UniProtKB/Swiss-Prot annotation:
Disulfide bonds: C18-C24
Protein's name according to its UniProt entry: Brevinin-1BYa
Function description: Antibacterial activity against Gram-positive bacterium S.aureus and Gram-negative bacterium E.coli. High antifungal activity against C.albicans and a strong hemolytic activity.
Organism: Rana boylii (Foothill yellow-legged frog)
Keywords, in A-Z order: Amphibian defense peptide, Antibiotic, Antimicrobial, Cytolysis, Disulfide bond, Fungicide, Hemolysis, Secreted
Family: Belongs to the frog skin active peptide (FSAP) family. Brevinin subfamily.
One GO process term, biological-process aspect: killing of cells of another organism
Amino acid sequence: FLPILASLAAKFGPKLFCLVTKKC
């Protein structure tokens, strides 16, 4: 797993989770 992808996932993961689950 690429470090860049890992950092992107860490950065955008919570936002995606927020949008999908509507739990912000």
